């Protein structure tokens, strides 16, 4: 359990806590200890059966989903895991007591076996969603598919059609739709409290250090290896505004985005290509000392530090080595990133309703969306 406690002390942080400008400021409670702040409804009756789940992709997101089984063992049990890393498979095996023949290097190995779980959580990289989703649907698994569903319309349609033909449930991990605040907004709109919706103004503040971690140094920095930022980061938000608009379909879209800061042209004159060796590290807001090492030295190895230690060893020595040699220790102005750091989207819906959305990577706050909904009777 120590592995999971280190990595996910803040799974149930509420939106106010997530506003912190520090990466791991409030990661001082485990999910079990933080039930009052959790998004789950703890008053639900105990279910009559436990859902068995196969986790495909044991990274940060796959592990977060699996942690539900740790907190609620009568509701869910992880019975298999797919991940190419031995350290990840061993941790899952230990925490979830997985049988020897139910952890795999490749999802194809699991898909070739006779069905052994009721559902599968697919948390592979963005561009690797379609093939496992189609394969497991054909085997009769119900599917929780991490967002985005896929990175092309064709792949999305194939996933949906296969699930329909196979008679299995498909849920995409647009988890913000189920947050109490999102549900309350939907409730008020449907009740006509502000009349007919005229316009939605919505901002997603990614957080400056989060953007640097995930979309400059990290896994989502190159469109060819993942997808564009609006898809990888802000599909939550596009899903929300469409959800709030109800049956009104989007008719027109215009969008502009730029990558104007995290470029080689903006690299400080005396900066090094590696952050740990850089002479301007102390004054840089993207210093790995500030984002990772500061908290690790206090014993905190939860996200985002957990992602840096890809070998599964959570100590200062392993973290320092990863920062010295791996992608997360690179200068943010000397990476191979090419995705937008800010983007605006204007949408026109049926009935003349409009939406103005902004994704901004240069904010102090992280994850605290700002939404104003204007209606015919108020806002």
Where does each model-flagged region fall?
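Rossmann-fold dehydrogenase core element
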Residues: 158-175, 195-199
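Predominantly a Rossmann-like dinucleotide-binding segment in NAD(P)-dependent oxidoreductases
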Residues: 176-330
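Glycine-enriched catalytic-core subsegment of oxygenase/oxidase enzymes
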Residues: 325-379
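N-terminal Rossmann-like dinucleotide-binding module
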Residues: 2-18, 22-98
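Short, Asp-centered acidic motifs that coordinate Mg2+ and/or phosphate
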Residues: 80, 119, 199
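Beta-loop-alpha module in the N-terminal Rossmann-like domain of NAD(P)-dependent dehydrogenases
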Residues: 98-162
């Amino acid at each position: 359990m120590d592995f999971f406690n280190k990595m996910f002390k803040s799974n149930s942080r509420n939106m106010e806590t997530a506003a912190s400008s520090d990466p791991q400021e409030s990661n001082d409670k485990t999910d079990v200890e933080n039930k009052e702040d959790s998004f789950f409804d703890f008053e639900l009756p105990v279910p009559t059966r436990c859902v068995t789940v196969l986790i495909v992709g044991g990274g940060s997101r796959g592990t977060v989903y699996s942690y539900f089984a740790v907190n609620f063992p009568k509701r869910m049990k992880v019975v298999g895991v797919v991940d190419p890393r031995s350290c990840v498979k061993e941790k899952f095996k230990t925490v979830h007591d997985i049988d020897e023949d139910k952890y795999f290097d490749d999802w194809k190995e699991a898909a070739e076996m006779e069905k052994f779980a009721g559902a599968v959580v697919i948390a592979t990289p963005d561009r690797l969603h379609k093939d496992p989703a189609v394969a497991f649907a054909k085997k009769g698994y119900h599917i929780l598919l991490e967002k985005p569903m896929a990175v092309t319309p064709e792949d999305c349609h194939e996933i949906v059609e296969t699930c329909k033909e196979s008679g299995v449930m498909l849920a995409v991990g647009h988890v913000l739709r189920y947050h109490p605040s999102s549900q309350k907004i939907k409730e008020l709109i449907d009740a006509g409290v502000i009349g007919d919706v005229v316009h939605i103004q919505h901002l997603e503040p990614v957080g400056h250090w989060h953007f640097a971690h995930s979309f400059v140094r990290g896994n989502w920095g190159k469109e060819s290896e993942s997808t564009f930022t609006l898809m990888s980061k802000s599909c939550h938000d596009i899903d929300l505004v469409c959800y709030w608009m109800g049956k009104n379909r989007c008719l027109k879209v215009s969008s502009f985005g730029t990558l104007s800061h995290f470029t080689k042209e903006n690299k400080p004159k005396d900066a090094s290509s590696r952050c740990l060796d850089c002479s301007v590290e102390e004054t840089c807001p993207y210093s790995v000392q500030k984002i990772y090492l500061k908290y690790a030295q206090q014993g905190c190895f939860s996200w985002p530090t957990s992602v840096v230690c890809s070998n599964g060893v959570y100590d200062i020595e392993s973290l320092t080595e990863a920062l010295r040699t791996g992608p997360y220790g690179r200068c943010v102005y000397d990476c191979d990133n090419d995705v937008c750091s800010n983007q605006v989207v204007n949408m026109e819906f049926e009935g003349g309703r409009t939406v103005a959305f902004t994704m901004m990577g240069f904010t102090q706050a992280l994850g605290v969306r700002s939404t104003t909904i204007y209606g015919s009777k108020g806002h």
